[in-house]
């Protein structure tokens, strides 16, 4: 633990903590260090030179996980766009041209394609990727128009990463979408039709999980995917009640919804993973229109889900 009045501009941490890390790196024979914050290019370079090992900041780690999870062409485009924006923002500190990106820690994606990461080629590639994403966005718009004409309500599943959105989608629709406890196991949106116990037919869409301190360029890159929540009629906010940081995660979701300008939608909070609790958790989310204790694993509460014109909780 180190308490500083300000973050060191060159190495993020102070000289004393840097010396401690040097000893730890040698003792553990470490090949890499992960920093749970975003580092500037100067800080990345300073730490790598001082510690003589690979440094990954929070954003680079998230990008690496995204690259490993991307399956569809759209997901891969969005990941590459976010990676290149990250690289572009750091070129000034690392020089006008970086060496070719190879495989290994922190370099998945553009490195595997042997991209030259100088400014000119990055700008050209970003322009191309944005054009491709615009085509995807237009295609999504056509699909949304078709859904609108069908007059079937659309509900978007949102939540902090690993809250159990895909598991709920599977439990509700009988589908077999990949559901994993891994971070960001879902990068691509999936829509399934569902008839609720009250007979109401809806379309249910899974979305990418949110996370605390999600960088803005990641939100921008995945905007076409996140727009599914923006254009939905209802929001089903899935919460992992077994997580000790549940309240923080819920706030992150609401902050992200606000940034996406969808916080005014009708929201039903699904307090998931009740099967992991010693006693049922009945908590009213006063920011939502309704709250319901559920378990995707056991089916608890799923038959009670109702989204027709919910009334704001008092």
Residue spans for each PLM region:
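Conserved C-terminal guanine-recognition region of P-loop GTPase G domains, centered on the G4
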Residues: 41-48, 223-290
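Conserved beta-strand segments of the P-loop GTPase G domain that flank and frequently precede/overlap
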Residues: 1-3, 34-36, 237-240, 269-272, ...
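Residue-level signature of catalytic and energy-coupling elements of molecular machines
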Residues: 33, 84, 122, 168, ...
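Single conserved hydrophobic/aromatic residue that forms the stacking wall/gate
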Residues: 306-314
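Conserved G1/Walker A P-loop phosphate-binding module
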Residues: 109, 116, 121-124, 131-212
């Amino acid at each position: 633990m180190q308490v500083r009045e300000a973050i060191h501009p060159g190495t993020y941490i102070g000289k004393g903590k840097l010396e401690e890390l040097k000893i730890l790196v040698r003792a553990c024979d470490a090949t890499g260090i992960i920093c749970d914050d975003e580092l500037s290019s100067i800080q990345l370079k300073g730490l790598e030179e001082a510690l003589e090992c690979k440094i990954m900041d929070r954003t680079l780690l998230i990008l690496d996980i995204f690259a490993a999870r991307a399956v569809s062409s759209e997901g891969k485009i969005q990941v590459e766009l976010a990676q290149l924006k990250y690289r572009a923002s750091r070129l000034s500190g690392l020089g006008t041209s970086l060496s070719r990106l190879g495989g290994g820690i922190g370099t998945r994606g553009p490195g595997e394609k042997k991209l030259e990461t100088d400014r000119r080629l990055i700008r050209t590639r970003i322009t191309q990727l944005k054009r491709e994403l615009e085509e995807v966005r237009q295609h999504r718009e056509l699909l949304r128009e078709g859904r609108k004409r069908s007059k079937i309500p659309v509900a978007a599943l949102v939540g902090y990463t690993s809250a159990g959105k895909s598991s709920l989608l599977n439990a509700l629709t009988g589908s077999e979408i990949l559901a994993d406890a891994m971070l960001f196991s879902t990068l691509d949106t999936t829509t399934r039709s569902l008839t609720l116990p009250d007979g109401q037919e809806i379309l249910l869409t899974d979305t990418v999980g949110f996370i605390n301190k999600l960088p803005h360029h990641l939100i921008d890159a995945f905007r076409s995917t996140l727009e599914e929540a923006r254009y939905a009629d209802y929001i089903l906010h899935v919460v992992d009640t077994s997580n000790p940081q549940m309240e923080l995660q819920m706030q992150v979701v609401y902050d992200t919804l606000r940034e996406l300008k969808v916080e005014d939608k009708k929201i039903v909070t699904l307090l998931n993973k009740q099967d992991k609790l010693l006693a049922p958790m009945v908590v009213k989310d006063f920011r939502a229109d309704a709250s319901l204790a559920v378990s995707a694993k056991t089916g608890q509460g799923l038959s009670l889900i109702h989204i027709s014109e919910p009334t704001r909780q008092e």
